[in-house]
C-alpha cells in the first residue's frame, strides 16, 4: 500500500495530512477526497494487483485509472521544480496548458514517456484528481481557490 510504503499510517488525516481525509486507500475503504476548488467529491484507492499497479479514481459513475507510480513521479518532479505549478486540468480530448501538472501527466518527457492515465478516452483530468491525494498523503501543498489552483512539493 502506498501509505505503508511511504511510512504514512493507514487512516491518513489529522496531523499527517494538510487536509482532513477519510478512508485508507483500499477498495473497501477508499480515500474520500474533494477537488481543489472544493466543489466536487470523489474516491480513490490503490490497486497494486493491477498490471501496472493503478490508482483508481471514481467520480460519480465514471472510473478513471492512473499508474500508481504517478504519486512518486509527480512528487519528484515537483521537488525539482521547487516552486508552485498550475494544475491545469483538462479532458483527454482537449490540449493541456503548457507548464501545468496536466501537461506533465501526458508528456513524452515524463518518466513513463506519455499518459499516466490508463484507459483511452478517460486519461485526462490528472491535474484535477491526483494533486488532492498528494496533499492528503503529506507530499504536496495544493491551493483551494475557485480556479487556477497550484501545487508545490513538501
Label every model-predicted segment:
Residues 3-15:
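Short, Lys/Arg-enriched N-terminal segments with co-localized hydrophobic residues
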Residues 19-90:
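Long, low-complexity, charged/polar intrinsically disordered regions in eukaryotic proteins
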Residues 145-154:
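Short, cationic-aromatic polyanion-contact patches
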Residues 135-145:
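A short, conserved structural fragment
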Residues 121-136:
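Short amphipathic alpha-helical interaction segments
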Residues 93-112:
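Short acidic, glycine/tyrosine-flanked loop/strand segments centered on an H-E-D-like triad
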